[in-house]
Amino acid sequence: MIERAFQKEVADVLGLSDHECSPITLDQERPLYATAFGFYESGDYRSAAQLFAQLVLTDPYSVHYWSGLASSKQMAQDYLAAVHAWGIVSLLKENDPISHFHAAECFLSLDEKEDALKALNAALELAGKNEMLLEKINLLKTIHYAKF
């Protein structure tokens, strides 16, 4: 279990309430993850985000928990919190372009085009031969940055 002061810092950055950052025990992690995933799958993104936030505060080094939180926040249109969470995912999984791509989507939703372009370029650099992702990156660049 991580220190409560650190939990509070993470919660503040993500804009979480005290209820969302109540600690859980290690034996609660697996069922809580299944419940969070179920909420996400059913479209209840706010409930999913609340549970993923508790999981993140229990194990801040879990890429799965941060990805779940980032995805839930993004789908709930809490784009700033999603950007912060995608940033942590990119630190924990540094060679994965997906977190950069999703951060770019959030930045575009926040009308932060300069930051979005940086994130798209980072995703492009890491995408390798992932044709589907390359197409998505180029589509966003064409839509948002093409000079007409």
Which positions does each model-derived feature cover?
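Ankyrin-repeat and related helical/solenoid repeat scaffolds used for protein-protein interactions
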Residues: 87-118
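Long, contiguous interaction/recruitment modules in multidomain scaffold/adaptor proteins
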Residues: 1-28
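Alpha-helical adaptor scaffolds
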Residues: 26-98
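Register position in tetratricopeptide repeats
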Residues: 41, 75, 109, 142-147
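Structural signature of alpha-solenoid helical repeat scaffolds
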Residues: 23-24, 57, 91, 125, ...
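TPR/TPR-like (Sel1-like) alpha-helical repeat modules
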Residues: 108-131, 138-142
